[in-house]
Amino acid sequence: IVIEDNKPEAIESIKNAIRPEDEIEVKVLKTKYPQGAERQLIAAATGRKISSSKLPVDAGCIVDNIDTVIAIYNAVCESTPLIRRILTVTGDAVSRPSNFNIRLGMQYTEVLEGAGGYKTAPEKVITGGPMMGVALFSTDVPVVKNSSALLCLTKDEVAQYEPSACIRCGTNLH
């Protein structure tokens, strides 16, 4: 189990829950962004490099985030299908940034109402994270199983940058 070092309570909690016979290792990584992509995470945690033609399982690894692990547990142990999701609503344009446990299929518009709506008109609304998220042109779309966040950004929060030949391949991060 890999956890970044900026989450000391999670590290302690997981370590206390693991029994020696579980044969589970907790690997604490230095906090670094971006580091959450599968290949980056495997390299940081194990030192193994995976070519783009290979899968994580080829390196003896499975990479799942906590939401996926919980969904697997609920499906296998509780016979509960994936019907809910924790969604973070944040950004300076939203009145009350919050985390919500919502039903899949709920409209982002409804979730925003739960966060008090906009306190100022957003310059950009993104579903997902700031690096890999997707801009929404309307919040009248449903939350789906891979939704994790709704970023409601003001003009000041939206990065202004010059166009460049960079395709964000990540090569210069190593």
Predicted segments — roles?
Residues 143-154, 159:
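Glycine-rich and small/hydrophobic secondary-structure elements
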Residues 12-13, 38-39, 136-139, 162-163:
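Short, well-ordered secondary-structure micro-motifs
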Residues 107-108, 130-134, 157-158:
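Short, catalytically relevant binding-site loops at active-site mouths
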Residues 1-3:
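Short catalytic-loop micro-motif centered on adjacent basic/acidic residues
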Residues 159-174:
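Cysteine-centered iron-sulfur cluster-binding motifs in ferredoxin-type domains/subunits
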Residues 5-108, 114-121, 129:
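Hydrophobic alpha-helical positions that pack around
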Residues 87-89, 119-148:
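Ubiquitin-like/PB1-type beta-grasp interaction modules and other compact soluble beta-rich domains
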